[in-house]
Amino acid sequence: MTVETSQTPSAAIDSDRWPAVAKVPRGPLAAASAAIANRLLRRTATHLPLRLVYSDGTATGAADPRAPSLFIHRPDALARRIGRHGLIGFGESYMAGEWSSKELTRVLTVLAGSVDELVPRSLHWLRPITPTFRPSWPDHSRDQARRNIAVHYDLSNDLFAAFLDETMTYSCAMFTDLLAQPTPAWTELAAAQRRKIDRLLDVAGVQQGSHVLEIGTGWGELCIRAAARGAHIRSVTLSVEQQRLARQRVAAAGFGHRVEIDLCDYRDVDGQYDSVVSVEMIEAVGYRSWPRYFAALEQLVRPGGPVAIQAITMPHHRMLATRHTQTWIQKYIFPGGLLPSTQAIIDITGQHTGLRIVDAASLRPHYAETLRLWRERFMQRRDGLAHLGFDEVFARMWELYLAYSEAGFRSGYLDVYQWTLIREGPP
C-alpha cells in the first residue's frame, strides 16, 4: 500500500460522494508533512491577530481575546491534510468538521490579507501549498464547458433561491452609499442588484429598439430590465436549470415577445448586435480561451458599438502562479475556472482585438457586502438543505465558499470591475 492510498476514514462522511474528504492522509510522508504544517500553523498565529484554540483547551496566537479564533477539533487530521494538499486540504478539513470558527470570514480575511508577508511563497494559505495540477482536458471544449457549468449552476434552482434575493441575481450588487451605510440590510439587496444591472445597461447604451446580446443568462433579471426599456435581447447560457427558470421569469414579467434565451455556447453565436453585455462569465471561460472570448465580443457587436462586462479579478502575479494548478475552489465549486487579472484583460483586448477600454469601475466593497448578505441568508436557511438532497458536508463546503469569497474582497485579494469597451471602427 502506497503512502498516498494509506488513509484513515473520517467518521460520518459519505465516502462515495466525498472520497477525498472522507479520508485523512496516512503514512510517513503525510506525517512529515503534517509536522511542517503544524509548525506553520503555530508560526502564523504568532504573527497575526488570530487565535488557534485546540480541543484540549490550550490556545496559541494573539493575546487579544477579541481576535478571531480558529477552533481545531482534530489537530493531526488538519495538519496532515494541509501538509499533503495545501489549501485543498485546508478546505477539505473544514468540510470534514475538523476545524471551525464562529467568525469564519474574519479568520479567512486575516489569512488572505497577510499571505505575502508571513508565509513562504510555496506555502501561501490562499494558494496550493503543494502543487496540485489541474486535470488535463482540451482547451475548454464545448462539452467540457457544459459539464463545468452544470457542476455549479445546475445544482438546484431551489438551492440558489434559498439565499438569493427576489431578482435571483448571482453577481455583485451596487449599493447606494457604503461610506454612509457600510453594512446594508437584506431588504436593500434587490434594489442594489437592479442598480448594478441598470448601470451596465446604461454604459451599453441599451434603449428602446436596441438589439442586445447577453452572454451568460443567470436567472434572467438583466433580460427583464433590458426588455422593460423596450430593447430586444438574446441571451445565451449553458445551464439547463437557469434557462428553464429564466424563461419562466421573463414570461411572468410579460416580456416573452422581446426576449430569446437559448442554450448555446458563446462561440456558436452569430450575427451582430447594437451592444453586448456579459456579467461575471469570463471567470468560467478558462485562461486559454480568454483571447477567443474577447474576440467573440468584438465580432458580435457592431463597429463603434459598446461592450459592457462585469468581471472578478485577482492580482496578476497570483493569476500566473495559479493558472496551471488546481485550488479548492476549482475542485469543489467552479471546475475549469480561473479569475483574470486586470493586466490580463488589458493585454488581451489590446493585443488580440479591436476593442478599446473606455472605463473600468471597481465595485470591490460592494461585493464584500453582497457576499455577506448571501452568507447570512444561507446560514439562516442552512437546515433546509437536507430536504433538497444536500448533506452536512455540502453545507460546510458552501459556507466556506461564501466566507472565503467575502474574505477575498475584504482583504483586497480579489476585486470586481465593470468594464466598458468600444469596438473601434466606423459605426
Curated annotation (Swiss-Prot):
Its EC number is 2.1.1.-. Optimum pH is 7-8. InterPro entries: CFA/CMAS, CMAS, SAM-dependent_MTases_sf. Inhibited by S-adenosyl-L-homocysteine. It comes from the Bacteria. GO terms for molecular function: methyltransferase activity. Pathway: Lipid metabolism; fatty acid biosynthesis. It is an enzyme of class 2 (transferase). Belongs to the CFA/CMAS family. One of its GO terms (biological process) is methylation. Transmembrane segments: none annotated. PANTHER family: CYCLOPROPANE-FATTY-ACYL-PHOSPHOLIPID SYNTHASE (PTHR43667), FATTY ACID C-METHYL TRANSFERASE (PTHR43667:SF2). This is Tuberculostearic acid methyltransferase UfaA1. The keyword Methyltransferase applies. Involved in the biosynthesis of the tuberculostearic acid (10-methylstearic-acid or TSA), a constituent lipid of the mycobacterial cell wall. Catalyzes the transfer of the methyl group from S-adenosyl-L-methionine (SAM) to the double bond of oleic acid in phosphatidylethanolamine or phosphatidylcholine to produce TSA. The keyword Heme does not apply. Keywords: Cell wall biogenesis/degradation, Lipid biosynthesis, Lipid metabolism, Methyltransferase, S-adenosyl-L-methionine, Transferase. The gene is ufaA1. It holds the Pfam family CMAS.
